[in-house]
């Protein structure tokens, strides 16, 4: 199985710089992105053969995650169940028959840890 995880720092700008060519060349089974920085309806990606799942931040232009997968999952969940954090679109969990796959975008804690 081949999976890729990439912090794109804004998917719309990344698409303009050749994201789709890279995506197609990788032929990943699962492709995760972090820091999508978009809202629902801002971008329509046509990726034949892939199921798409997005978790958007409430705040415009902030965080967000996405997963593209060839195999359709049994279930999809968004967030951690903690409202304060779930508003930022940082977690997507896919359940498959034999495993779970999770993409997470964690904030930089600076020196606060």
How does the language model describe each region?
Residues 1-47, 57, 62:
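N-terminal, active-site-proximal structural segment of metallo-dependent hydrolase catalytic domains
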Residues 37, 43-111:
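Structured beta-strand-rich core segments of catalytic domains in phosphoester-bond hydrolases
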